[in-house]
Amino acid sequence: MNSIEVIEDEVVSILKGIAGIFSFKIAEQVNEFLTVTDGEDSLQIILRGHLYVEYELERLLRHNIENPDSILTDRFMFMNKINLAIALGLLPKSRKNTYKKLNDLRNKYAHKLRFEVSDKDLDDFISVMDEEVKDDFSEKHKDVDVKDIKLKLKHVLSAVWMDASKTVYIREVEKYKEQMDAVRELCRTFGGNEEQFITLKRQKLLELKERIEFIIDEY
């Protein structure tokens, strides 16, 4: 095995390590949400879900803008964060209806003393979900036979939260790919051998792994 093949094997190993960290943390977060909401009423579940999703949105923004404290103040509300994330290309525009629906549901509770979430409310929520988020909900809820509104609510909210959390990690990977594309283009333009490129790729992957571990430790 030559030096390039050795480094390529290391790169594959690092990529698997990153995927493992990412998958484990996401699964852990979902289980935590389902556990801590046991015994809570619908209002508590919605408020907690809204809070968790907003936390992920703020993390996404803080990791991708300069001087975040200048804009992420107490007056910068949930939908402001959604709109800013979309404007900066950090969140797909197609996700807006999903997150807005969560905010609308939360506001219904805030403004109606006797509001109770219904099956129709949840079906309306699911109907505006992006396909990826909807598929995640369907996977969580597929083995539920009884009509349990609270469980359905928890599965809806955990699907949205998982999407927000994944977006934070995926953006870090995208930044790594952008760096590698730029380096590859420089190599083509100014010269540079494959071994140098792969060595740099390994270095950047290690930095990415450390970055993701740092983000995970924020919890």
Regions found by a protein language model. Give the residues of each.
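Amphipathic alpha-helical interface elements
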Residues: 2-84, 90-218
